[in-house]
Curated annotation (Swiss-Prot):
InterPro entries in alphabetical order: ApaG_domain, ApaG_sf, Uncharacterised_ApaG
Organism: Nitrosospira multiformis (strain ATCC 25196 / NCIMB 11849 / C 71)
Protein's recorded name: Protein ApaG
Domain (ApaG) ranges: 3-127
BP GO terms, sorted: error-free translesion synthesis
HAMAP family (UniProt xref): ApaG
Record PROSITE patterns: APAG (PS51087)
SUPFAM superfamilies xrefs: ApaG-like
Lineage: Bacteria, Pseudomonadati, Pseudomonadota, Betaproteobacteria, Nitrosomonadales
Length: 127
């Protein structure tokens, strides 16, 4: 068996613009994102920390690192999923996020689960 399949976490993302928390006059655009993590590998793994790279449409980039997600460090057995919702604010109507989750497998191996880049966009801005 290939090692890549043994340690594998799939990441799916859904975003929502939050107009009620945004203020365009102050260049504040707030988005919620829902993440679904699925352990598609063959070993149990725990999410230890996260690393986000958040970019706005004017070239501004911020990096966020921290332990766990929404105050938790979920343990995912093979076949398990974990879902959470969080949010971010950027200074332009369009931006993007990407990053990785740092995982530790039950055998002690540490590995990264990549978070593919996704777009943050106010509705009707991008076609």
């Amino acid at each position: 068996m290939a090692e890549g399949k043994k340690y594998e976490i799939a990441v799916k993302v859904h975003t929502t613009y939050l107009p009620e928390q945004s203020d365009e006059a102050l260049d504040r655009y707030v988005f919620a994102y829902t993440i679904v993590l699925s352990n598609t590998g063959t070993v149990t793994a725990q999410l230890i920390s996260r690393h986000w790279v958040i970019a706005d449409g004017s070239g501004g980039v911020q990096e966020v690192r921290g332990l766990g997600v929404v105050g938790e460090q979920p343990l995912l057995k093979p076949g398990d999923t974990y879902e959470y919702t969080s949010g971010t604010a950027i200074s332009t109507p369009v931006g993007s996020m990407k990053g990785s989750y740092q995982m530790v497998a039950e055998d002690g191996l540490r590995f990264d689960a990549p978070i593919p880049e996704f777009i943050l966009s106010v509705p009707r801005i991008l076609h």
